[in-house]
């Protein structure tokens, strides 16, 4: 009987030990790459299928380059080409792709489509992003924090903005990696009920509130994201609600003097963050972007049993 594939769908699906093994492998791969040691090709002969229902820059390039650096190949399939769930069923798509490729990464708004694909695939499936969660991004974020400030355990991360997929994965990471997460959102844009219920039952050190100053006070890191995400409506109303949550120099001064600033990009400068902050010495946004490549290499290797 064949082994069940190692999927990477959500941080809560894996143990802390498994997530730490992925990060350790990612750090080691980055170090070897920086030292010019590029002969190691653990995924030689392997093919990654990348499925996108929306255009993507960072996710597409980082997975494509990452797979190539590990010795494998990547092919891209768009929503228009796939008609995922509109023509051939998701289940049949999963079964067919599993006969052609060794691993699948999908970036799709519907989390249910992701889980259905994984349920029927006989090869590993990676969550490249859904409306519910963005685990690859937060693995890169944790890696970035630890590069600059050491172990994240026991530290405090502050989120200011609204409820979205990145926040959900930060909450999951807080539970798995044992750090404190302070969340500040407008009441109208507070975490959704399933996430709020999970936070209450998880025992994680996560504090929900509406005051951005209280959330960031004494924090080791401040994180934000765009105010209007893919598919969001009522942009003007959201902007009015979120304007007090902008990360600016005044807000940064309430955090620790060496606090990091993170943003998964693309950023809308002058909205959720000022130029002064995102271009300032505490900003590590481009390290985060680079670490998407390295963290995802660790994830690819783990899923295919070549590391971790």
UniProtKB/Swiss-Prot annotation:
Location(s), subcellular: Cytoplasm
Gene Ontology molecular functions: amino acid binding; ornithine carbamoyltransferase activity
GO cellular component: cytoplasm
Record flagged with keyword Transferase: yes
EC number: 2.1.3.3
Residues involved in L-ornithine binding: 165, 225, 229-230
An individual GO BP term: citrulline biosynthetic process
InterPro entries attached to this UniProt entry: Asp/Orn_carbamoyltranf_P-bd, Asp/Orn_carbamoylTrfase, Asp/Orn_carbamoylTrfase_sf, Asp_carbamoyltransf_Asp/Orn-bd, Orn/put_carbamltrans, OTCase_ArgI
Pathways involved: Amino-acid biosynthesis; L-arginine biosynthesis; L-arginine from L-ornithine and carbamoyl phosphate: step 1/3
Keywords for the protein's UniProt record, in alphabetical order: Amino-acid biosynthesis, Arginine biosynthesis, Cytoplasm, Transferase
Reactions mediated catalytically: carbamoyl phosphate + L-ornithine = L-citrulline + phosphate + H(+)
Gene3D superfamilies for this protein: Aspartate/ornithine carbamoyltransferase
SS bond partners: none
PANTHER family for this protein: ORNITHINE CARBAMOYLTRANSFERASE, MITOCHONDRIAL, ORNITHINE TRANSCARBAMYLASE, MITOCHONDRIAL
Family: Belongs to the aspartate/ornithine carbamoyltransferase superfamily. OTCase family.
Protein task: Reversibly catalyzes the transfer of the carbamoyl group from carbamoyl phosphate (CP) to the N(epsilon) atom of ornithine (ORN) to produce L-citrulline.
Name under which the protein is recorded: Ornithine carbamoyltransferase
Organism field: Nitrobacter winogradskyi (strain ATCC 25391 / DSM 10237 / CIP 104748 / NCIMB 11846 / Nb-255)
Gene: argF
